[in-house]
């Protein structure tokens, strides 16, 4: 039986196939079967889909030139961790910066943006796992997960990362 995520916000079959191929290629790098390099690249915040699609489209041109040596994974980081909890927290919390926060609309918006990146560029994205409980909602659209400096020592983040099917990287510690 299909879950609500897959019924309401499905990933097209061709994107599922693309992601599986990219995940296998990335796994080959991680396990040493491939001598390519992985490059996770892009801005620290993705809160405007038009801008994200613009820069990821530019990355496609670079990827084509270096495809024999490098796999580019675009950073599409949809959360903004805040040390004090004050300030814009990213697209997940507030998909429209001109409106009030709306977490449900944010979940839909970030899922849509990740799917659109794959549809338009054939690059499978990375996102930061600020909230481990949200990983399931994006698990079928991400090829890399980052754990940020504020979360890297958190047990829940470590447990979730140990059970996911894509590479998880950590950002520098806070000390």
Regions found by a protein language model. Give the residues of each.
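N-terminal glycine-rich anion-binding loops that anchor highly charged ligand groups
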Residues: 25-39
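N-terminal glycine-rich phosphate/pyrophosphate-binding loops that anchor nucleotide-derived ligands
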Residues: 5-29
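Glycine-rich anion/phosphate-binding loops
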Residues: 47-63, 102-110
């Amino acid at each position: 039986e299909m879950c609500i995520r897959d019924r309401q916000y499905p990933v097209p079959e061709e994107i599922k196939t693309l992601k599986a191929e990219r995940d296998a290629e990335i796994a080959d790098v991680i396990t040493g079967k491939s001598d390519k390099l992985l490059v996770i690249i892009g801005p620290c915040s993705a809160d405007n889909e038009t801008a994200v699609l613009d820069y990821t489209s530019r990355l496609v041109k670079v990827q084509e030139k270096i495809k024999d040596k490098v796999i580019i994974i675009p950073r599409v980081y949809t959360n903004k961790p805040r040390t004090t909890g004050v300030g814009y927290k990213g697209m997940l919390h507030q998909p429209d910066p001109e409106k009030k926060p709306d977490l449900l609309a944010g979940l839909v918006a970030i899922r849509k943006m990740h799917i659109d990146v794959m549809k338009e560029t054939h690059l499978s994205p990375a996102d930061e796992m600020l909230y481990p409980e949200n990983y399931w909602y994006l698990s079928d659209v991400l090829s890399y997960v980052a754990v940020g400096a504020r979360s890297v020592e958190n047990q829940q983040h470590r447990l979730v990362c140990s059970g996911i099917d894509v590479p998880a990287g950590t950002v520098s510690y806070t000390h």
